[in-house]
Curated annotation (Swiss-Prot):
<dbReference type="InterPro" id="IPR012404">
    <property type="entry name" value="UCP036436"/>
</dbReference>
<feature type="compositionally biased region" description="Low complexity">
    <location>
        <begin position="234"/>
        <end position="288"/>
    </location>
</feature>
<feature type="region of interest" description="Disordered">
    <location>
        <begin position="317"/>
        <end position="347"/>
    </location>
</feature>
<feature type="compositionally biased region" description="Low complexity">
    <location>
        <begin position="338"/>
        <end position="347"/>
    </location>
</feature>
<keyword id="KW-0175">Coiled coil</keyword>
<dbReference type="Pfam" id="PF00169">
    <property type="entry name" value="PH"/>
</dbReference>
<feature type="coiled-coil region">
    <location>
        <begin position="8"/>
        <end position="210"/>
    </location>
</feature>
<feature type="compositionally biased region" description="Low complexity">
    <location>
        <begin position="317"/>
        <end position="328"/>
    </location>
</feature>
<dbReference type="InterPro" id="IPR001849">
    <property type="entry name" value="PH_domain"/>
</dbReference>
<feature type="region of interest" description="Disordered">
    <location>
        <begin position="215"/>
        <end position="290"/>
    </location>
</feature>
<dbReference type="InterPro" id="IPR019152">
    <property type="entry name" value="DUF2046"/>
</dbReference>
<dbReference type="Pfam" id="PF09755">
    <property type="entry name" value="DUF2046"/>
</dbReference>
<protein>
    <recommendedName>
        <fullName>PH domain-containing rcdII</fullName>
    </recommendedName>
</protein>
<dbReference type="GO" id="GO:0016020">
    <property type="term" value="C:membrane"/>
</dbReference>
<feature type="domain" description="PH">
    <location>
        <begin position="353"/>
        <end position="461"/>
    </location>
</feature>
<dbReference type="InterPro" id="IPR011993">
    <property type="entry name" value="PH-like_dom_sf"/>
</dbReference>
Length: 464
């Protein structure tokens, strides 16, 4: 029983051990499997971590490469922008330098133009000055020559008196009687001419008085102090008194020659008659009869004599008449103006005044054949001159002026289409150049246009 029990217990023990062994084996298997699983998971984790590390490294490398590329691109862009800015700045500098050079050239050209213009104006002023100086010298020389001639006349008269007192020759007396007869005939002719001159003077005076009254009534705006009719009356009275005094002196000389029986030699008579300077009252009358043929020469001679010496004798007046008649020429076709001579010095009765002044635009043609308007300051005086200045101070006159005695027509073109509100004034002037008529055009406001026209037309020559 005990053996059976022992066998049973050993069997159970073996079975238990076998069971335990199986459980251990199973457990060992499970552990081995777990270990394998852990190893596999560890390997997988390592692979994943390696892959992740590679991915991260690759990602960072790509990012670094992108940053490097962006850095290089930015550096290129910065260089390009710097080059562009430098190029643009250089171009701007070049354009500015060119503009500077152009402006300097323009300034030099303008300075040269202004200098040349001023030099031309100075030359014109110097020419005018020289012309005035020559005119003054000529007038002074004429005055000196007149004084010399008067002195020579006095000396010759003294010689004639000496010859008449010393000579008692019948031949000279006969010759003087013959000359006396001839001179008497010439005196008669001169008296007839004098009557004609007086009639012409009266007609001229009446015409001028009518014209002056008409102009005074029409142009009451113009203030001109002119005493022309009185001067004409004085000239006619001086001519009549001088010629009557010459006739009385001639008759008195002939009576003295016939009564006293004084004579001169033939040589002296021939020399005195051949020269232009009168030597005796008889030769004075002969020279006056030969030289005085027109009304203009008689009036001029009498006026010059009366203005030069008011206290001289009748013989001196006649001698000066003859000298002036010999030097002056007859003027028959001179147009009559409104009691205005060519200069204020030749007519002391005329007092020059400024009638109108103001700004006008004068049309001129440039070098490119285009019409340009030049604004200038003009003044019109009673001596018939229209002067041009650069400004209203009238310190710098231009070389251009218009003599209204040569103007024969004036027209107005109203409402200029190129310049609204302005009208054109056209002056037609006679010239001695190739083109006989010159047209000068001025532009001014339509309100002042008629005023300028009235002023200019009042100073134009009268149409006969």
């Amino acid at each position: 029983m005990d053996s059976n029990a022992a066998e049973k217990s050993s069997k159970e023990i073996i079975e238990d051990l076998q069971r335990q062994l199986l459980t251990e084996k199973n457990r060992n298997r499970t552990l081995v499997e777990e270990l394998k699983q852990l190893r596999d998971s560890h390997a997988r984790i390592q692979i994943v971590t390696e892959n992740e590390e590679e991915y991260i490294t690759n990602k960072f490398m790509k990012y670094l490469n992108q940053l490097k590329k962006e850095k290089e691109e930015l550096a290129l862009k910065v260089e390009q922008e710097e080059e562009y800015l430098t190029n643009t700045l250089q171009k701007k500098m070049l354009t500015i330098m060119k503009e500077k050079v152009d402006l300097e050239n323009q300034l030099e050209q303008e300075e040269e133009f202004i200098v040349n213009k001023l030099q031309k104006q100075i030359q014109d002023v110097m020419k005018d000055k020289k012309a005035l100086e020559k005119r003054l010298e000529n007038e002074i020389n004429d005055h000196r020559s007149l004084l010399k001639l008067q002195d020579e006349v006095i000396v010759l008269r003294d010689k004639i008196k000496e010859l008449e007192s010393n000579g008692n020759k019948k031949e000279d007396i006969d010759a003087l009687k013959a000359e006396n007869f001839v001179l008497g005939q010439k005196i008669i002719r001169e008296q007839e001419k004098l009557s004609k001159v007086n009639s012409e003077n009266t007609k001229l005076m009446s015409n001028l008085e009518i014209d002056d009254e008409r102009n005074f009534n029409n142009k009451s705006k113009r203030n001109r102090s002119i005493s022309f009719p009185t001067s004409m009356a004085s000239t006619t009275t001086t001519t009549t008194t001088s010629i009557t005094s010459s006739t009385t002196s001639i008759t008195s000389s002939t009576s003295s020659i016939n009564s006293s029986g004084s004579s001169s030699t033939n040589n002296t008579c021939n020399n005195n008659s051949s020269s232009n300077i009168p030597t005796s009252p008889l030769s004075c009358s002969s020279n006056s009869s030969g030289g005085g043929g027109g009304s203009g020469s008689l009036n001029n001679s009498c006026n010059s004599n009366c203005s030069n010496s008011s206290n001289s004798s009748n013989n001196n007046c006649n001698n000066n008449n003859n000298n002036n008649n010999g030097n002056s020429k007859l003027s028959t076709g001179v147009p009559i103006t409104r009691s205005r001579s060519s200069s204020s010095n030749s007519n002391p009765c005329l007092i020059t005044k400024i009638v109108k002044e103001g700004w006008l635009k004068r049309k001129s043609i440039s070098s490119s054949n285009q019409e340009t308007l030049e604004k200038r300051y003009y003044e019109i005086s009673t001596d018939g001159e229209m002067r041009e200045y650069f400004d209203e101070t009238k310190q710098i006159p231009t070389s251009q002026y218009i003599n209204l005695d040569t103007c024969f027509q004036i027209d107005i073109v109203t409402d200029n289409p190129n310049h609204p509100g302005y009208s054109d004034i056209k002056l037609y002037i006679k010239t001695n150049s190739i083109s006989p008529v010159e047209i000068i055009t001025f532009s001014t406001s339509s309100n002042d246009c008629n005023d300028w026209k009235d002023t200019i037309s009042s100073l134009m020559p009268l149409k006969r």
